[in-house]
Amino acid sequence: MADADREPRSGLCADGMTARELRADVPALSESAYFNFGAHGPSPKYVVDAASEYIADHEYGSGTTDPYTRAFETYEAVRERIAAFVGAEPDEVALTESTTDGINRVAGAFDWEPGDVVVRTDLEHPAGVLPWKRLEREGVEVRVVETEGGRIDREAYADAVADARLVCFSAITWTHGTRLPVTELVEIADDAGAFTLVDAVQSPGQVAMDVHDWGADAVAAAGHKWVLGPWGAGFLYVDRDAAAELAPRAVGYRSVKSPNAGEIEYKAGAKRFEVGSTTPAAHVGLTEALDAIEAVGIDAVSSRIESLTDRLKAGVPADRLLSPRRYETGLVAIDVDDPEATVERLAADDIVVRSLPHPDAVRVSVHAVSTAAEVDRLVEALEEEW
């Protein structure tokens, strides 16, 4: 085992903020060895403060400042910040509650007919399963592309999408932590004339993102995992041309050009997917979290995650490691005899991981704000499983 006190050099950033400094800003990380960022990334104090202060200012200042003007100015400011982070233009971004919310908004914008085909993989989170399962009631066929070890077979995928209307898959699998070839899968779907929707929730804050490079019609994500933002700060990218062909079923005064017009005329771009009077407080917090990640540097974050993840995998026997031995992301699936019992046992020692429904395993999420000492502690605690 490597020296627990030696930290990966990749945590350093030229602008002066380090991953260690970011960690010190997150109160929850002083309570345990936390390895569940793939589900929830605890926020720095200033992220929570920004969201709380926005609510206070919006509510307490409404006697002197129009609350709608304030909210709409904030919608646009946070939209611009999110767009810059993911490589989009502001009008291509809708503010949502979550990835699940974004996927549902897209699913509800099609005029589905019996016989239409939706394709997904067998590794999708329920966010990428349940909206399509509901459509089966309307006669929509849902095809599931089987994977092996977190990998997708290109030929099987191409066959499945040949006559599909929509394809939904994850950029990073939440089970194995594998990175799917997004651009290639999008191109195959495009050639078949299918709409492509990418679940990218495991990407922001862990890897650099450029949705234009991916070429997908839509990308749903959120900032409450690797970005360390608050719950409720979701976002949905929709290509301009793709958006023009979609008519969301959920519609309100924020969706349309003129709420009092005789006919519904949706706003251009992704704004048509926004509905009513939601607080942008969570997204205000998210912008603070994005600033923190960028202060460290996304390349430095990714490099440090790689160093710490490799350290973890070095302590896991080959027959127990379900994720690729070679690094892809900080999500690591480990085979244990009783995942739920293992999660509880580790929690009793103040080590936080989670169980997976499929494969039957525990999942460890290693972040740049994790430490080498924590990784070594986890490996030691897992040794009784082998």
Language-model segment annotations:
Residues 1-386:
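Pyridoxal 5′-phosphate
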